[in-house]
Amino acid sequence: YHKLRCAISMSLEVSIATYPMFESQFVANVAEAMVKAEEQAIISGSGSGQPKGITKETVVTGQNIDIAAATTALAYTDLVKAEAALPQAYDADAVWCMSKKTFFEQIVGMVDDKKQPVARVNYGLSGKPVYSLFGREVVLVGDYLPSFTASVTADTIFAFIFNFKD
């Protein structure tokens, strides 16, 4: 069990002579910093003094897809293997997680053997982009995962499929 703690101190002058705008912005900044710390821990926490992150868990045999170190681009078959490795019990609510750079440079524009795109960028009801890969939502987590590069080193995790309800 881990707690995220944020210790804040204010001088007497600040606590007495402060503006409401300053107070609300201060609270928003603290909340954003805490959310980022939680996201970092969920994805790549070391497990020592913080939660063990998704990328630090021991992968079940057969659920890790290795990409050759000399690979300059992801292949359609790599993505298909990753989808196939996901146990069916997790299929309904699982999402792809990767950096925006990996998604746009490696996957957008990729087509299957019928020349149909495997990734889509749609604009939702709010006008914000909605990303998908094989019909599965893509969550961009670029601040917490490295992007795929042609010189990717061994054991570098640049994308994963996960059910965040777990």
Language-model features: locations:
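Structured, hydrophobic secondary-structure cores that serve as assembly/anchoring elements
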Residues: Y1-D166
